[in-house]
Amino acid sequence: CRELEARVELTQNAFTKLWDPQHEHFYNRDEFTGELIRVPTSACFLPLFAGLAGNEQVLKMVSTLENWMDQKFLLVPSTAPHEPSYEPERYWRGPVWPHINWMICEGLSDYGFDDLSRKIRMQTLELISKLGFYEYYHPLGESGLGGSSFSWTAAVCLIWDNSTNTR
């Protein structure tokens, strides 16, 4: 039990080192330099899923998601639309990934942001319904990308279909 508690504490401490109070984002960290990689990505929202974000951090993440939504992008692009490295069809540089959206939606609901979670879920399901079970999608809903019969996309649909009555 103590070993497990120590691992949990290590994980919590690691997450606190990923928060950048100046930019109000969780960021990835370069393993070699130790520097934060200050590019907002969909990974910035995964602390919601882990349950490791504080209340102020959650509010900042929700604000960021709403800002991205106001820019007419379907959520959640894998790289922030305003970033120079954003490319809507390039692997992990802009497309929407259903399994990442599922984790973000779960986290949003866990923190009480059911309306935003529902919006993201519905946008994602509409993309899948319109375009098919692709690996990932153009963030403006223009096309499905990558593999065209992707099991994790189907799994996300099944999970959301089975949880409709519980959320």
Describe each region flagged by the PLM.
Residues 6, 96-99:
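Short acidic alpha-helix initiation/capping motifs at coil-to-helix transition points
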Residues 1-3, 111:
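Inter-helical turn/loop segments and adjacent helix faces that build the functional surface
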Residues 118-124:
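Hydrophobic transmembrane alpha-helices and their immediate junctions
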Residues 43-54, 101-114:
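Alpha-helical support elements that line or immediately flank enzyme active sites
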Residues 12-96, 123, 129-167:
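Extended glycan-interaction surfaces of carbohydrate-active proteins
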